[in-house]
Amino acid sequence: MAFTLYSLMQAALLCVNAIAVLHEERFLKNIGWGTDQGIGGFGEEPGIKSQLMNLIRSVRTVMRVPLIIVNSITIVLLLLFG
């Protein structure tokens, strides 16, 4: 199997899909990454855990429709070209 641009894009799509399907109450709260985490005081930078939670929330919010479109295109391409 050759390492091509298509396989790189497909791996990135799988990673974004993995982030998008993480459910907050079912999975993230069980490992201690729920929304009840406090964000430090005024002037303090948020920790890495809260930054990762913001990233996961942002990916789920912003990438919902584009992921549906890109996943559909990928499925059609795989069906057509194997």
Curated annotation (Swiss-Prot):
Coiled coil: none annotated. The chain crosses the membrane at residues 2-22, 62-82. The keyword Membrane applies. Pfam families: Yos1. InterPro entries: Yos1. Disulfide bonds: none annotated. It is a multi-pass membrane protein. It is found in: Endoplasmic reticulum membrane. Its main location: endoplasmic reticulum. Keywords: Endoplasmic reticulum, Membrane, Protein transport, Transmembrane, Transmembrane helix, Transport. GO terms for biological process: brain development; cell maturation; chromatin organization; endoplasmic reticulum organization; gene expression; glucose homeostasis; insulin metabolic process; negative regulation of apoptotic process. GO terms for cellular component: endoplasmic reticulum membrane; Golgi apparatus. Regulator of endoplasmic reticulum secretion that acts as a key determinant of brain size. Required for secretion of extracellular matrix proteins. Required for correct brain development by depositing sufficient extracellular matrix proteins for tissue integrity and the proliferation of neural progenitors. Acts as a regulator of the unfolded protein response (UPR). Belongs to the YOS1 family. This is Immediate early response 3-interacting protein 1. It comes from Mus musculus.
